Structure formats: C-alpha cells, structure tokens
Amino acid sequence: MNRQVIKKTKKSRQTANKSQIRDVFTVICKTDLGVECVKEYKFHPERRWRFDYAIPEHKIALEVEGGVWTQGRHTRPQGFLGDVEKYNQATLMGWRVFRTTPTDLYRTTTINLLKMAINTPFLP
C-alpha cells in the first residue's frame, strides 16, 4: 500500500469514529433531555453554515470547538473570524449558541447547561 492509500484509510476511519461519537450525543439529548438533537444542522438559508448540534424546537445550538491545544481551525485567525460571523448571524436569527470542547461534550455540566437553556425562555 502506498502512503496516500494508508492516509485516506486512516482519515475515513477517524471520520467514521467521530460520526459514531456524535450519534451518541444525540441519543443522550433524547434520553436525558427529552428533545430531538440534530447533528450538522444547516441553520442559514443562504450560507452553508452548520451547527455541530442543534435543538431546532428551542433554537439552541451547541458548537464543539476542537483544536484548542493544537492550534486547530477555531483558534487560528481566519477560522476564529469566520466563527464570529457565523455566531453573530445565528444570534440575529434568534438562536442561542453555546460552545464546548470535545472533552466536555458528554460532561454533566454541558447537559445541565442545555437543560437550563431548554427550561429558560429566550427573550428576543
């Protein structure tokens, strides 16, 4: 096998694993919070922006900010500026956007934060 094939194989395995992990979070939302959570939810009618997770019924979004310690896309200047634009537009559209890290995604604090948001009406 050449290096490119090995690289593609590793990448597809990593993508599959991430997808399975995210499905677990949507199940947690359903069982613990009693709401439908959608992964990769497209919220803007014109832009290709997506939330990592969304609870559309309550207009609550959860963004998982990866690469915090490794200079990932969200922490580099261009990625950060893009996120600012995305989050501001989402807020103007009435969304409440919460941010977390991959490490904190399944923690009780994150689930409790979403629970409080669901039980607290958003005042426009």
Show where each model-derived region lies.
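Nucleic-acid endo/exonuclease domains
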Residues: 1-124
